[in-house]
Structures are given as structure tokens and as C-alpha cells.
């Protein structure tokens, strides 16, 4: 373990289901630190007992994350090393973590992250959907206004979308996504990742609603949804411009104070034709 004037905060990823997914480095760190801060000590004690780890433990969760962060920082100022763990996965990824990390940096406390399990990445890599660019939304917001705002943003999202959902809200969320993104949008539904009853389903949003009419949702879900096609967006945008008369299209830009020459250039680009074609059409 690295030596610093203060202690260090170690972000330790824990298994999302299969205990064999824990890393040697995380196990060593959990044994060597002075204290483990756990999202739910009742859950984490089972993990530590399984690996015969006797390190003292304290709670760090959503409802004490600020006050407790400063208490833990005080201990690290005294030279204590602390490991942060959650019920499953990587701290800070849809779990407590980001606030204490920010506070540690503000207070000059070193932070390091030990790589490991994360349900979002596990699901994405085996989804069969594009992995180069993705948008991780975690659980959709509970606040109604914010919830709707996120759905509206997803309408034009071209990256692969990752959403977490609980079984009792799954059908409602699939219906909202269907209504927002369209029934033909493809997705991969991952359930109970790394566990005995792990399941992956590839289908459209429309098919997913039919499927869950006869299959009761069980377990925790990760939804991997295809982003919107750029080609499709371009075609829709072009169709929108073409629905305007040429004069209306020109007026759209000229009303913004754009001179006629530049307006013709933009209209030509919008319609996928040459500036000369626009000029000649306007002369008729």
C-alpha cells in the first residue's frame, strides 16, 4: 500500500453477483486498510466474512454521504486508509461515491480506484449494440419533470443508451421508451448479470412490451438501447426543410439577419443541392 502523509481513499469494486469476480487487489486492500466504509454494512459483512476479512466497518450511504464524508476525511488526515465499497459494483457508478471523492480532492486526500465489476459495462459489452460511444443514464429520475426532460433528451441521442431498472418499474419504463423512441428501436435486456439465472434478450421495444405481458419481470435489469441513427435524423431534417417552399426556407434564415447570399448557401446545404440550383430556382 502506497505511503502518503495522510491516509488514502480506496474505491473498491465488488462483485455484482458472482463472488469469483472480485480481484486479488481488492481483497488485499480490504484486508490492509484501517476501515471499510460500506453502503449497507449488513450486505457487506457477508462479503467480508466470506473472504475472512476482519477489517472494521462503518456505514456510508445516500443519506449520510456529506456529513460522513467529512468524518472519514478527518480519519484519513490522521493517516488512516479507508476502503469504500457498495452493495455491488463500482463506487460512484449509480451508487454513493462521487461526493466523498470530490471532498477528498478539496481536502487534499489521495484517492485511487481499484477496477472491477460494473453492471453497465458488463451488459454493454455483450449487448451486440455499438460500444464505442454510449450514454449511461443509470436509473431514470424519480422527479416527474426531470424524468420527462431526460426522456426528451433521449429522442435525439445517437449514442447507445444504458438504463438501470427494478422489476416493479420495468414495464412502465419500457412503455415510456417505446412512446418516446419508437417501437422499432432495438434493445438488449440483461437480467441478473453474473448470477445463476442471468438472461439476455435482444428485441425491439414493441416486442419487449409483448414479452412482459406474459412474463413477469424478476431481478435487476440493465437496458441497452440502440441510439438514434444519424442517417435517419438527417433524412428527417431534410424532409422537414423540403416541406417548406423555397421562399419560406430562405425567409427562415433572412429573418435571423443572415444576408441573402449566406442564406442561399445554407438552404442549399439543408436540401442537399448546389447553391447554383437554389439561385436558379429563385429566379423562376
Regions found by a protein language model. Give the residues of each.
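Loop/turn-to-beta-strand initiation segments
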Residues: 8-9, 78-83, 159-160
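Short active-site oxyanion
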Residues: 30-36, 108-112, 160-161
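Glycine-centered tight-turn and secondary-structure capping sites
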Residues: 96-98, 260
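Class I SAM-dependent methyltransferase SAM-binding "motif I" and its flanking Rossmann-like core
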Residues: 99-157
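Short glycine-rich anion-binding loops that position phosphate/pyrophosphate groups of nucleotides
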Residues: 16-17, 87-91, 167-169, 228-230
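Glycine-rich, flexible N-terminal cofactor/catalytic loop recognition
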Residues: 1-63
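A contiguous loop/helix-start segment that scaffolds small-molecule binding in enzyme catalytic cores
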Residues: 6, 160, 167-284
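Conserved helicase motor
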Residues: 58-66, 140-143
Amino acid at each position: 500500500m502506497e505511503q502518503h502523509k495522510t491516509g488514502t481513499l480506496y474505491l473498491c469494486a465488488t462483485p455484482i453477483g458472482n463472488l469469483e469476480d472480485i480481484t486479488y487487489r481488492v481483497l488485499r486492500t480490504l484486508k490492509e486498510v484501517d476501515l471499510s466504509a460500506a453502503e449497507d454494512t449488513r450486505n457487506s459483512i457477508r462479503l467480508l466474512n466470506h473472504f475472512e476479512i476482519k477489517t472494521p466497518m462503518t456505514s456510508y450511504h445516500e443519506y449520510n454521504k456529506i456529513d460522513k464524508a467529512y468524518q472519514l476525511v478527518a480519519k484519513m488526515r490522521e493517516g488512516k486508509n479507508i476502503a469504500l465499497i457498495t452493495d455491488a459494483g463500482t463506487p460512484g457508478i449509480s451508487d454513493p461515491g462521487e461526493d466523498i471523492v470530490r471532498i477528498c480532492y478539496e481536502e487534499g486526500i489521495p484517492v485511487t480506484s481499484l477496477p472491477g465489476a460494473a453492471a453497465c459495462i458488463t451488459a454493454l459489452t455483450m449487448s451486440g449494440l455499438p460500444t464505442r460511444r454510449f450514454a449511461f443514464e443509470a436509473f431514470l429520475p424519480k422527479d416527474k419533470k426531470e424524468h420527462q426532460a431526460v426522456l426528451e433528451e433521449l429522442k435525439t441521442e445517437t449514442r447507445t443508451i444504458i438504463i438501470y431498472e427494478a422489476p416493479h418499474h420495468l414495464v412502465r419504463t419500457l412503455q415510456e421508451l417505446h412512446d418516446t423512441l419508437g417501437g422499432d428501436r432495438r434493445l438488449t435486456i440483461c437480467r441478473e448479470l453474473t448470477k445463476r439465472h442471468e438472461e439476455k434478450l435482444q428485441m425491439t421495444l414493441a416486442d419487449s412490451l409483448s414479452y412482459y405481458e406474459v412474463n413477469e419481470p424478476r431481478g435487476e435489469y440493465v437496458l441497452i438501447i440502440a441510439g438514434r441513427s444519424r442517417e435517419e435524423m438527417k433524412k428527417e431534417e431534410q424532409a422537414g426543410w423540403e416541406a417548406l417552399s423555397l421562399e419560406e426556407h430562405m425567409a427562415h434564415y433572412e429573418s435571423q439577419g443572415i444576408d441573402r447570399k449566406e442564406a442561399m448557401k445554407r438552404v442549399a446545404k439543408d436540401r442537399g443541392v448546389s447553391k447554383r440550383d437554389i439561385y436558379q430556382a429563385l429566379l423562376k
